[in-house]
Amino acid sequence: DGSWKRSTGQATIIYGEVMPETGGETHFCDMYGAYERMSDAWKARIADLRAVHNLDFSRTRRHGEDPMTDAQRLETPPVDHPVVRTHPETGRKCLYLGDHAEYIVGMPYAEGRALIEELNAMAPHADLTYEHRWKLREMIVWDNRCLMHRATAYDPVTQGRVIRRCTVLGELPV
């Protein structure tokens, strides 16, 4: 969580208070494994790249929801992070992308977008992913620095979903 911030989240804790009957699952992807499975040529290609992460892009332009106000855009300006992040505790490298990554610094926009989409598509291998099907009052904790996550769609008109989240502040990705 929070890749659109300069200092990113170290860990996230979420608690399922109200869950839909269908949909709303949370999927996780091991980004250590995704990086480690890449060929040496791919690793060399992306080693020094930086991606710009932008909340306005992921919320408004990418998904067409929750348009941000000008004040919100000023509070959350785009930030750049390395595409390959080194975990500060384990020293292992992992891909650091996801939905908020908009473009690659120094690359033509369309080319950078295509590369991000390709890398995001390469990451999820069946044995590197986990789908959590929520039960009421469950809690999950994960390390944001090496896992990518997303929720599946559900119908908010007919079903409720209330997730309480606490993000432990982290550090600047390197």
Segments predicted by a language model, with ranges:
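Non-heme Fe(II) oxygenase catalytic core, chiefly the N-lobe of the double-stranded beta-helix
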Residues: 1-139, 144-174
